[in-house]
A protein has these predicted regions:
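Extracytoplasmic/secretory-pathway segments with low complexity and glycosylation-like composition
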Residues: 1-197
Length: 197
């Protein structure tokens, strides 16, 4: 079996198994691919090895893959999920004073708090907001409507860093960055804002 059961591209996990031929060699492969790993079975017929997930190819959604391990006469298979790391909110434009959005996050793993770190146009951290807790093997979060700017903002381009750390660091991994520009009022209209990129 594999632990955990869901991975980002090149994520690291643990492959374990039992009931194989003691002291024999094992090989592993993904369905439709060549061999991806080999090793030696211990004297009790057990396998314990590091697993590196393949690269995720696509733009959205999880994929289910099958990993097979064999020592020749015995074959064991297990499935796991491969996911992208995504974060988004909608609507993507509106008056920042009143804009309420629904966040969608995928890929941070199960049972993690999800945090949005608000980096102001001057590059300084303004606020960190916890928006919920992930669930499921791959870490899914869907929020109800919440204020996008629950504090006084300044004009310019903000950066939202989304990650699973309650403390902000520009070096946190994994993380996602989303830009949001707030424009000054003009021609009798109030301030407006919209996601960039």
């Amino acid at each position: 079996m594999l632990n955990p059961g869901c991975y980002l591209s090149s994520g690291i996990g643990l492959l374990t198994g039992s009931g194989f031929t003691p002291n024999a060699s094992w090989t592993a492969k993904l369905t439709g691919t060549k061999q991806i790993g080999t090793g030696r079975i211990d004297g009790g017929g057990r396998i314990r090895a590091r697993f590196t997930a393949p690269l995720y190819h696509g733009t959205a959604g999880t994929r289910t893959l099958t990993l097979s391990v064999t020592d020749g006469p015995h074959v064991a298979s297990t499935t796991f999920q491969l996911t992208p790391l995504t974060a988004s909110f909608g609507p993507r434009t509106g008056d920042p004073q009143t804009l309420r959005v629904r966040w969608r996050v995928l890929g941070l793993g199960p049972n993690h708090g999800v945090y949005v770190h608000y980096v102001a146009p001057d590059g300084r951290l303004k606020k960190t907001l916890r928006i919920g807790t992930t669930h499921g093997a791959c870490g899914v979060l869907k929020t109800g409507p919440i204020a996008l700017f629950p504090f006084r903002y300044t004009y310019g381009t903000w950066t939202f860093q989304v990650d699973a750390n309650h403390t902000y660091s520009a070096r946190t991994t994994p993380r996602l960055l989303i830009g949001f520009e707030i424009r000054r009022p003009s021609r009798g209209r109030g301030p407006s804002g919209g996601q960039t990129g």
